[in-house]
Amino acid sequence: MKTVGHRLGLPELLILIGSCSFIFVLWLSAYFEPDIRWLHFFQAWMYFSAIWLSAHRSRWGYLIGLSAAGLWDYINIFVTTFFRSGLHWLFAWVSTGQLKHVDQIIAVPAWIGNFLVVAGSVWAYARLPEKRRGDLGRLALAFVLTTGFFAASVAVCQRRYLPLFRGIIHPHRPW
C-alpha cells in the first residue's frame, strides 16, 4: 500500500468534516437514547478508519468512507423514515420557532455528514494518479466488510434494527 504524505487536500477535508459531524451525531443520539451507545461506538470506528486511511491518502480509506457513508445515506432514503422525519421537524422548528423532536432532527446533519464523506471519497479516488483494475473488487470487498461489520454490531448491540438489512435488499421510498 503506497501512501503519499499527511497533507489533507479538499477531498480528505470533506471526509474529515463529514465523518466528524456524523460521529458527533452518533454521540448526541447515544446521549438521547442510551441503549444504542455500544452500537454507535462500534459504528464510529468505520468513520475513524476512513479518516485515518484517507489522511494517509490510502484508497482503502476512500473505499471504506464511500461504503459506510453511502450505505447509511441509502438506508435513510430508501429504507427508513428517519431522514424524512428529521426534515419535517427541522422545517417545523424553522416555521414555528418551537424546537421539538431533536432526536429526529439530528438525522439531517447526519445525512449531510455522510453525504460529505461520500463526495470526498469519490473525489479523492477520482484524483488518484493511478487507478487499478482491482479497485472495483476492492470497493466490493470494502462494502461487504463495512456492511458486515455494521450488521454484526447491530446483531450484538441492537437486534431490533436487523430488519433494516432486509430493507437494503428490497428498497422502497418510505415517504
Feature-to-residue mapping (PLM):
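Short aromatic-rich membrane-water interface segments that cap or initiate transmembrane helices
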Residues: 94-109, 174-175
